[in-house]
UniProtKB/Swiss-Prot annotation:
An example Gene Ontology biological process: cytoplasmic translation
Species in which this protein is naturally found: Schizosaccharomyces pombe (strain 972 / ATCC 24843)
Encoding gene, per UniProt annotation: ths1
Enzyme class: ligase
Keywords, ordered alphabetically: Aminoacyl-tRNA synthetase, ATP-binding, Cytoplasm, Ligase, Nucleotide-binding, Protein biosynthesis
Protein name: Threonine--tRNA ligase, cytoplasmic
Family annotation (InterPro entries): aa-tRNA-synt_IIb, aa-tRNA-synth_II, aa-tRNA-synth_II/BPL/LPL, Anticodon-bd, Anticodon-bd_dom_sf, Beta-grasp_dom_sf, TGS, TGS-like
Predominant subcellular localization, coarse grouping: cytoplasm
Sequence similarity: Belongs to the class-II aminoacyl-tRNA synthetase family.
Length: 703
């Protein structure tokens, strides 16, 4: 783009009178290198190639000339207008980038996860262009996320972005969209990149640390913006029909509070305005359900800067926390798990043995004690390995299922901390199963049954995905992996649930099953995990006595042999803190009775009824019902309204009439007919009904 064109864009966007020097420098270098690229492209041999579509149809094309968008157009104009990205030989590919050889081709639109990711990534570049022109800022990173996209930037003089800036940013973005600026891809050497982004210390750091010397990577241009990016992108900015800035925040470069403070702007975009309106409706509902708001309004928990990332659970919040622990302990008891208690800190020698010190130490809190280095545990598995090894084990002892609610600490960057979903101090329903290879399938089936009961109780649906052996780096022999994967597949098939294969995405120490739950707003959360581990039993030299075969016994004169157990990592809730956040938003603060921190509120109609209210309160407390009594000076209607807003499951109004009949007037939170006037129930009967409802763990609030 020429200098005149740049000025034209700037003028049309906001009548900018001041040209931004680094923009022109970037464009001049881009134009020079693009000219060289086009000259080299012209020399590429044009040969006939076969392009195979997902349905098996083969289309003829020409190498270095035919593009995915031209293939889409040959099928239908509607398809060409709708698609956002191509998948060529399994890899994302720009629709306007020429195909280089015979290949497979898949075309994705916004409804495809990869298509949506590319759509939002391209939208992030539009946001980058808009903020750069708005604030003359130095851009940092601008990725797509699960819920849109964001861009981080450093702004001179410590300028902070506010809600008042949104309309200006959106105006620049809409002008860029209107101009249908093409996304242009260019490969540039590390040296060229350092020169192109010489003005931007954040890009300089990324280039220096992420790109090896002598290597190259890609940049993309749309309008005046050129950014370091691997792509791919939509053909042009006009594909984004609806664009909005959603929020802003401060962050730190690389998420580290020691680095520069940055401004982060979030956005959302869609291929049509209808989807934007639906999203805004969803957003309004999500805001009402935000666990941080509900936690504050219901006085469940809070955070304080004296201990970042560590939650203060207030009495009513602790009720939820302890109810979940009690529920999991009940499940453990009936499923053959044994609860253990392990230390919170260990000498680093343990973490060196487990491999965490080399691979995870930056996420651990460590300190020196008497010239020895120790670290707070970020996970329980090494400690459980020490337990397994503490005495001889026989195959008759297996499977050995151990559960641990120990406090864990992970040194998350302060900029990444977010309510209960990203914390530094937390507890997990962490368990490890040590079993023989032949027991893997039955143990996994047991985990599925566990999942089904717990998530069904919460009202969640869930999705299963099997991640198998990585192509290159993995521990153990192929036969062991193949057998383990076959057992996992058999267990998945027997579960009755649909599942997907994520080939090659397993951990290096074993295959895993990822479980994604869907909440009331259809949002996805990964909480549970089931992972097989061949590494830790090897690292800790874990072994058990296994019966020797007849041939082995004959050769050794011993009927026993030592062999390695398989270790299964298993969590259902995951972090209790994160699960409480998810449940808070899933129920919108209207807790099912069995889990509710406010099960009953007793409201005496006057001071004369206080003694009777206390009597009923004590009866309910002795029955292990969470009950509060409102003896405030508020009027009766005000007390009732306050209890309704606090989401008590039931309100018991008591006065002289109820005292004379040893009863309570019951109002049900979820029954509109009983909001203004409840029904009278004997205390003895209501206690029985409450206990029955609590035991049933029903999601329906009904006596």
């Amino acid at each position: 783009m020429s200098a005149a064109a740049v000025k034209g864009v700037q003028a049309s966007l906001d009548n900018l009178s001041l040209e931004i020097p680094f923009i022109q420098h970037r464009l001049d270098l881009f134009d020079k290198l693009q000219k060289e690229y086009k000259e080299s492209l012209a020399t590429k041999p044009r040969e006939e190639i076969d392009i195979t579509l997902p349905d098996g149809k083969v289309i003829k094309g020409t190498s270095w000339e035919t593009t995915p968008i031209s293939i889409a157009a040959s099928i239908s104009k509607g398809l060409a207008d709708r698609v956002t990205v191509a998948i060529v030989n399994g890899e994302p590919w720009d629709l306007t980038r020429p195909l280089e050889a015979s290949c497979t081709l898949k075309l994705c639109d916004f409804n495809d996860p990869e298509g949506k990711r590319v759509f939002w990534h391209s939208s992030a570049h539009i946001l980058g262009e808009a903020t750069e022109l708005s604030f003359h800022c130095h851009l940092c990173i601008g990725p797509p996320t699960d819920e849109g996209f964001f861009y981080e930037m450093g702004i001179d003089n410590g300028r902070v972005i506010t809600n008042d800036d949104y309309s200006s940013i959106e105006s620049y973005a809409k002008q860029a969209i209107k101009q249908k600026q093409p996304f242009e891809r260019l490969v540039i050497s590390k040296e060229g990149l350092l020169e192109m982004f010489r003005y931007n210390k954040y890009k300089q750091y990324i280039i220096q640390t992420k790109i090896p010397d002598g290597a190259s990577t890609t940049v993309y241009r749309c309008g005046p913006l050129i950014d370091l990016c691997t792509g791919p992108h939509v053909p042009h900015t006009g594909r984004i029909k609806s664009f909005a800035v959603t929020k802003n925040s401060s962050s730190y470069f690389l998420g580290d509070a020691k680095n520069d403070s940055l401004q982060r702007v979030y956005g959302i975009s869609f291929p049509d305005n209808k989807q934007m309106q639906e999203y805004k409706t969803f957003l309004a509902e999500a805001a009402k359900r935000d666990h941080r708001k509900i936690g504050r309004d219901q006085e469940l928990f809070f955070f304080n800067e004296i201990s970042p990332g560590s939650c203060f659970f207030l009495p009513h919040g602790a009720r939820i926390y302890n109810t979940l622990l009690k529920y999991m302990r009940y499940q453990y008891s009936k499923r053959g798990y044994q609860e253990v208690i392990t230390p919170n800190m260990y000498n680093v020698n343990l973490w060196k043995t487990s491999g965490h010190w080399n691979n995870y130490s930056e996420n651990m809190f460590s300190f020196d004690i008497e010239k020895e280095k120790y670290a707070l545990k970020p996970m329980n598995c090494p400690g459980h390995c020490v337990m397994f090894k503490s005495r001889d084990r026989s195959y008759r002892d297996l499977p050995w299922r151990v559960a641990d609610f120990g406090v864990l600490h992970r040194n998350e960057f302060s900029g990444a901390l977010s309510g209960l979903t990203r914390v530094r101090r937390f507890q997990q329903d962490d368990a490890h199963i040590f079993c023989t290879p032949d027991q893997v399938r039955s143990e996994i089936e047991g985990c599925f049954d566990f999942l089904k009961e717990v998530y069904g109780t919460f009202g969640f649906t869930f999705h299963l995905e099997l991640s198998t052996r990585p192509e290159e780096k993995y521990l153990g022999d192929l036969a062991t992996w193949d057998k383990a994967e076959a057992q996992l597949k058999a267990a998945l098939d027997a579960s009755g649930y649909k599942w997907e294969l994520n080939a090659g995405d397993g951990a290096f120490y074993g295959p895993k099953i990822d479980i994604t739950v869907f909440d009331a707003l259809k949002r996805q959360h990964q909480c549970a995990t089931i992972q097989l581990d061949f590494q830790l039993p090897e690292r800790f030299q874990l072994e058990f006595h296994a019966p020797a075969s007849a041939e082995e016994a004959k050769e050794s004169g011993n009927n026993n042999k030592y062999t390695r157990p398989v270790m299964v990592h298993r969590a259902i809730l995951g972090s209790l803190e994160r699960m409480i956040a998810i449940l808070t938003e899933h129920y919108a603060g209207k807790w099912p009775f069995w889990m509710s921190p406010r099960q009953v509120c007793i409201i005496p109609v006057s001071a004369a009824a206080y003694n009777y209210a206390d009597k009923v309160h004590n009866i309910l407390s002795e029955a292990d019902i969470f009950v509060d009594t409102d003896k405030s000076d508020n009027t009766l209607p005000k007390k009732i309204r306050n209890a309704q807003l606090a989401q008590y499951n039931f309100i018991f109004v008591v006065g002289a009439e109820e005292e004379s009949t040893n009863s309570v007037n019951v109002r049900n939170r979820d029954d509109p007919k009983k909001q203004s006037k409840g029904s009278t129930v004997a205390v003895e009967e209501v206690v029985k009904k409450l206990l029955k409802l609590k035991e049933s763990k029903s999601l329906i609030n009904d006596l």
